[in-house]
UniProtKB/Swiss-Prot annotation:
Signal peptide: none annotated. Homotetramer; forms a functional homotetrameric channel resulting in the expression of a small M-current. Heterotetramer with KCNQ3; forms heterotetrameric M-channel responsible for the native M-current. Heterotetramer with KCNQ1; forms a functional voltage-gated potassium channel. Interacts (via C-terminus) with calmodulin/CALM1; forms a heterooctameric structure (with 4:4 KCNQ1:CALM stoichiometry); the interaction is calcium-independent, constitutive and participates in the channel function. Changing residue 191 to G: In a colorectal cancer sample; somatic mutation. It comes from Homo sapiens. Pore-forming subunit of the voltage-gated potassium (Kv) channel broadly expressed in brain and involved in the regulation of neuronal excitability. Associates with KCNQ3/Kv7.3 pore-forming subunit to form a potassium channel which contributes to M-type current, a slowly activating and deactivating potassium conductance which plays a critical role in determining the subthreshold electrical excitability of neurons. One of its GO terms (molecular function) is voltage-gated monoatomic ion channel activity involved in regulation of presynaptic membrane potential. This is Potassium voltage-gated channel subfamily KQT member 5. It is linked to Intellectual developmental disorder, autosomal dominant 46: A disorder characterized by significantly below average general intellectual functioning associated with impairments in adaptive behavior and manifested during the developmental period. MRD46 patients manifest developmental delay and mild to moderate intellectual disability. Residues 299-319 dip into the membrane without crossing it. Each channel subunit contains six transmembrane segments (S1-S6) with S1-S4 forming one voltage sensing domain (VSD) and S5-S6 contributing to form one quarter of an interlocking pore-forming domain (PD). It comes from the Eukaryota. A 1,2-diacyl-sn-glycero-3-phospho-(1D-myo-inositol-4,5-bisphosphate) binds at residues 248, 264, 361.
Length: 932
């Protein structure tokens, strides 16, 4: 778009950008009027604005007559001629001619398109004209044939001359109309486009036929005798009129498509047939050239071969010798089959192509129903209650339109009589009365300056509608009315002819005028239309032939297989894949993959739950066996261990499937297996660890004191206010019932006390008693016996224990280590049920060094470190005693309170104590023991 910043004295051209403030000052206060086209409506309505008063830049849409200041009248006159002009999206008029020329251009283009379709794309009655032209051409051909017969030469020549005159006129007019009507196509517009159209093959044929006809007629009329030879040659050119019958070239396109589709088969047949022709002709020529003069040359043999193999058989040349006849018969049988192949290939190709075209036409019939169905679906969707579409209701607002106020002023009484019953009812409604009142009040809302200047100028400007609150800020909810915006000066305004539509619609009708019941009715109608369109579309989907049925069946079968496969994939994702492989290696690989990757399917989860349930069942069975065997011991052991409370087993969270038999203590089992230690850490529970070894009741078991106990023990500072606890080994029972041996050692742990108990005395350190150890050589195992002594006895024992610990530290003596040893031939390890052994079957050995003790235990029981027995205290009341925790492996101790009662070891059956004779011992009473 050209842009030019004009001053006050310059004349504005079409499409100029002008600064209205400066232009108004230079022109003596004249104001610019800007016409803005309603692009969406496509009509000649102009919206006026008063931007000139604000000093904004305006786009002038006038012609050269549009000027500044005093040229406002020229602008008005030019804009009056622009009433019907269409505007582009950039605000530029699409047509610069008057409305009459626009209408003429529309008619011109319409006629041009119509004639082009009649001549190039005939439909309906247009075939009548083409049939007439065909009869003319065919009649001309017949007369040309009769003109060569001597008996009919005179009559045929005279009729042919008249017919050729008619043909020249018809073909000449048709050729000119074809060239002119081709301008409706974009590629054929202009003189270059016309030349491009004239170079088409059929236009070239028309030109040749027209020139030949003119030459023949001119030669006949002049009676030139020397032009007879030329006329005979031009007659052939007139035969080309038959070629132009198929203007669109559908026949040639069909033939070309068939030949192209079967080109390989045709080339193969023609190639083999040509080889047979060459060989047969040459062999017959060699045999017949001496005996038969008809085959004197190879060309004569080729002629004979062609006529014979094409099954024509003129009979002008025939072989005479028997050898030549045998060769011709053999090659005829072979060659005729290949020469006949192209005819069959082309015939089948034409049949298939015709059938395909029929199917294509059948499928093309589905386009309109499919488009109608899509349209109905969209309209039904857009009319939904939750839809925010505005445009979908606009087609239904036409029924609410009323005539413009201008037409009502011309004759309201006469127009009311011509109104239909529906319009009278609508106008009688409250909505119609409000529309009437708004239309009547248009003149009252006009500005005074407009009324004053309306008398002196031919134009008349109105103010815009004063919309109500509903549609004032919602212009998209109302129809685009043709009301202009107010302009202060009437000199730059446009006439009322630009203000109103061609239809004169002047009503303010919005989407909100459609009441909910009306919208509901519209939705119902659209739903019914949708169902009707769907039914019609289904009717067009009926199969055309058996091939379509097979294709539909195969497509449906393929879709079903895809859906089944998708369903199976989803089921496998939910339930897991239950693959059963015959190969062992592949099965192992699959199991390894399942172990490495977490299977989140339902099958994997079920398997995981089953494994965990089996592990829990095995653990519970083991614990129940232990509990039963402990209760079956003697009276003393029963009294001592009957108070053990075995709660339900609590599975470790770090391992999902490992049983207590397979669990390993990775923290320190490799170095500290079979050793007693005093743990003093404040974060981990305290406990006494007993290491159970695989043994039999008849075999001798040796317990060795490991020196690692001394190095791993941790001293606890003891204050005077704290209590003390003494742990010593003691034998419990001499008699034990025989019980089955467990497969692996078991870990038994007593949980620590609650941290809520704070002010309790601390225990004493663990010290061995050599005398007690000698007396307890024949004991089965060790247990804890709680003694109720006073504070003085506990303090005296604490002092002695301190001195003994110092002596152990100085001399490097070992602490007590309970390391059972049995021969290696035992296949199973003993459980807790073998904790109590008879004194006659067990011997305790004291190892002098750490290496000997640990080496002996490792030699006899290399796998013993995998299982341990932990006994810890559970909750105790404020008046009950609490036990310290002793571990064979180094474990940190939790902060806990200890009871004032001390613990010491003793024998339950013999009631003999390893400690001092004056100390009073009680039976083992551990009311809160928990397996963990």
């Amino acid at each position: 778009m050209p842009r030019h910043h004009a001053g006050g004295e310059e004349g504005g051209a079409a499409g100029l950008w002008v600064k209205s403030g400066a232009a108004a000052a230079a022109a003596g206060g004249g104001r610019l009027g800007s016409g803005m086209k309603d692009v969406e409506s496509g009509r000649g309505r102009v919206l006026l604005n008063s931007a000139a008063a604000r000093g904004d830049g305006l786009l002038l849409l006038g012609t050269r007559a549009a000027t500044l200041g005093g040229g406002g009248g020229g602008l008005r006159e030019s804009r009056r001629g622009k009433q019907g002009a269409r505007m582009s999206l950039l605000g530029k008029p699409l047509s610069y001619t008057s409305s009459q020329s626009c209408r003429r251009n529309v008619k011109y283009r319409r006629v041009q398109n119509y004639l082009y379709n009649v001549l190039e794309r005939p439909r309906g009655w247009a075939f009548i004209y083409h049939a007439f032209v065909f009869l003319l051409v065919f009649g001309c051909l017949i007369l040309s044939v009769f003109s060569t017969i001597p008996e009919h030469t005179k009559l045929a020549s005279s009729c042919l001359l008249i017919l050729e005159f008619v043909m020249i006129v018809v073909f000449g007019l048709e050729f000119i109309i074809r060239i002119w009507s081709a301008g409706c196509c974009c590629r054929y517009r202009g003189w270059q486009g016309r030349l491009r159209f004239a170079r088409k093959p059929f236009c070239v044929i028309d030109t040749i036929v027209l020139i030949a006809s003119i030459a023949v007629v001119s030669a006949k009329t002049q009676g030139n005798i020397f032009a007879t030879s030329a006329l005979r040659s031009l007659r052939f050119l007139q035969i080309l009129r038959m070629v132009r019958m198929d203007r669109r070239g559908g026949t040639w396109k069909l033939l070309g498509s068939v030949v192209y589709a079967h080109s390989k088969e045709l080339i193969t047949a023609w190639y083999i047939g040509f080889l047979v022709l060459i060989f047969s002709s040459f062999l017959v020529y060699l045999v017949e050239k001496d005996a038969n003069k008809e085959f004197s040359t190879y060309a004569d043999a080729l002629w004979w071969g062609t006529i014979t193999l094409t099954t024509i058989g003129y009979g002008d040349k025939t072989p005479l010798t028997w050898l030549g006849r045998l060769l011709s018969a053999g090659f005829a049988l072979l060659g005729i089959s290949f020469f006949a192949l192209p005819a069959g290939i082309l015939g089948s190709g034409f049949a298939l192509k015709v059938q395909e075209q029929h199917r294509q036409k059948h499928f093309e019939k589905r386009r309109n129903p499919a488009a109608n169905l899509i349209q109905c679906v969209w309209r039904s969707y857009a009319a939904d209650e939750k839809s925010v579409s505005i445009a979908t209701w606009k087609p239904h607002l036409k029924a609410l339109h009323t005539c413009s106020p201008t037409k009502k002023e011309q004759g309201e009484a006469s127009s009311s009589q011509k109104l239909s019953f529906k319009e009278r009812v609508r106008m009688a409604s409250p909505r119609g009365q409000s529309i009437k009142s708004r239309q009547a009040s248009v003149g009252d809302r006009r500005s005074p300056s407009t009324d004053i200047t309306a008398e002196g100028s031919p134009t008349k400007v109105q103010k815009s509608w004063s919309f109500n609150d509903r549609t004032r800020f919602r212009p998209s909810l109302r129809l685009k009315s043709s009301q202009p915006k107010p302009v202060i000066d009437a000199d730059t305004a446009l006439g009322t002819d630009d203000v109103y539509d061609e239809k004169g619609c002047q009503c303010d009708v919005s989407v909100e005028d459609l009441t909910p019941p009306l919208k509901t009715v519209i939705r119902a109608i659209r739903i019914m239309k949708f169902h009707v369109a769907k039914r019609k579309f289904k009717e067009t989907l009926r199969p055309y032939d058996v091939k379509d049925v097979i294709e539909q069946y195969s497509a449906g079968h393929l879709d079903m297989l895809c859906r089944i496969k998708s369903l199976q994939t989803r089921v496998d994702q939910i339930l897991g894949k239950g693959q059963i492989t015959s190969d062992k290696k592949s099965r192992e690989k699959i199991t390894a993959e399942h172990e490495t990757t977490d299977d989140l399917s339902m099958l994997g989860r079920v398997v995981k739950v089953e494994k965990q349930v089996q592990s829990i069942e095995s653990k519970l069975d083991c614990l129940l066996d232990i509990y039963q065997q402990v209760l079956r011991k003697g009276s003393a052991s029963a009294l001592a261990l009957a108070s053990f409370q075995i709660p339900p087993f609590e599975c470790e969270q770090t391992s999902d499937y490992q049983s207590p038999v397979d669990s390993k203590d990775l923290s320190g089992s490799a170095q500290n297996s079979g050793c007693l230690s005093r743990s003093t850490s404040a974060n981990i529970s305290r406990g006494l660890q007993f290491i159970l070894t695989p043994n039999e009741f008849s075999a001798q078991t040796f317990y060795a004191l490991s020196p690692t106990m001394h190095s791993q023990a941790t001293q606890v500072p003891i204050s005077q206010s704290d209590g003390s606890a003494v742990a010593a080994t003691n034998t419990i029972a001499n008699q034990i019932n025989t019980a089955p041996k467990p497969a692996a050692p078991t870990t038994l742990q007593i949980p620590p006390p609650l941290p809520a108990i704070k002010h309790l005395p601390r225990p004493e350190t663990l010290h061995p008693n050599p005398a007690g150890l000698q007396e307890s050589i024949s004991d089965v195992t060790t247990c804890l016996v709680a003694s109720k002594e006073n504070v003085q006895v506990a303090q005296s024992n604490l002092t002695k224990d301190r001195s003994m610990r110092k002596s152990f530290d100085m001399g490097g003596e070992t602490l007590l280590s309970v390391c059972p040893m049995v021969p290696k031939d035992l296949g199973k390890s003993l459980s807790v049920q073998n904790l109590i052994r008879s004194t006659e079957e067990l011997n305790i050995q004291l190892s002098g060094s750490e290496s000997s003790g640990s080496r002996g235990s490792q030699d006899f029981y290399p796998k013993w470190r995998e299982s341990k027995l932990f006994i810890t205290d559970e909750e105790v009341g404020p008046e009950e005693t609490e036990t310290d925790t002793f571990d064979a492996a180094p474990q940190p101790a939790r902060e806990a309170a200890f009871a004032s009662d001390s613990l010491r070891t003793g024998r339950s059956r013999s009631s003999q104590s390893i400690c001092k004779a004056g100390e009073s011992t009680d039976a083992l009473s551990l009311p809160h023991v928990k397996l963990k």
